[in-house]
Amino acid sequence: MSFLHDIWNPWHGCVKCSEGCQNCYMYFLDRMRDQNGAEIYKTKSGFSYPLQKDRTGHYKIQSGEQIRVCMTSDFFLEEADPWRVEAWDIMRQRSDVVFFLLTKRPQRVRECLPPDWGSGWDNIFFNVTCENQRRADERIPILFDLPFKHKGIMCAPFIGPVSIRQYLSAGQIEQVICGGENYDGARPCNFDWVKSLQQECVDANVTFCFIETGTVFIKDGRRYHLPNKQLQSRMACKSGMNFQGRPIHFDLVDDWGYPIPQEDLYVPHFRANCETCGSKLICNGCSNCGKCL
């Protein structure tokens, strides 16, 4: 998952709760480091990351950037209840930054919202994981019933066919992301599933991004093994599935509550290699970390 260059992990570790968790990449990577992914703890230096500033006194995360939250956990994990109020406060302070929340636990969300939530904060992009049809039918109706101004779906790991046409017609879903499974015991992703899901998004004018094929990819009846994420991303891009739907507009404001002019917002920058990345359509831009391609 490399579609945004900034990640904020206020806590680490998770409890598996559905089929998509079976081969969790976080558990795999922790095991490679001789750690236990089931051990849940609040991060120390990383917890306040969105508030950290550079030597010039400017925020490290610029106005208009988009940050993925809890990519090694779940923001609505029950074990994280003692820390969530503080995390909400950080997002409240950075009303100029978009926070991308993704959960497999939408049933817990309403009880976890801050008291001043109202109809939702405009800088929160709330997404639910729909790894198969069962979870789509379970989680999307809950998503629709929650007070968020921006909503999306992520079919990853994409382990079975998913149809969301009936949900897209409601007009609440602004973006759909899908990607195959990686690392430990990856289950196959079938290109037919991707094409079908993409067509539903095109018909509804909803942005669709196929970020990676996964390790095991089935196309035209042939089974392919793609051993690294860079290759998977390039193949996803090459498939031509990515589609830019209707624009998503976040009304970001400064510390005083005033709208931030468009010219003052962060503009993603990309390198040549980014042009063949499956995630470019929804990416926060290249951070020049040197880790990809």
What are the language-model segments listed below?
Residues 3-12, 165-293:
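Auxiliary Fe-S-binding modules of radical SAM enzymes
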Residues 21, 69, 101, 143, ...:
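Conserved, mostly hydrophobic/aromatic
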Residues 73, 105-107, 130-132, 157-159, ...:
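Active-site-proximal loop/turn and secondary-structure-junction residues that shape catalytic pockets
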Residues 83-90, 139-142, 193-197:
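A general structural detector for well-ordered alpha-helical segments in enzyme core domains, enriched
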Residues 92-95, 147, 195, 202:
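Anion (oxyanion) recognition and catalysis
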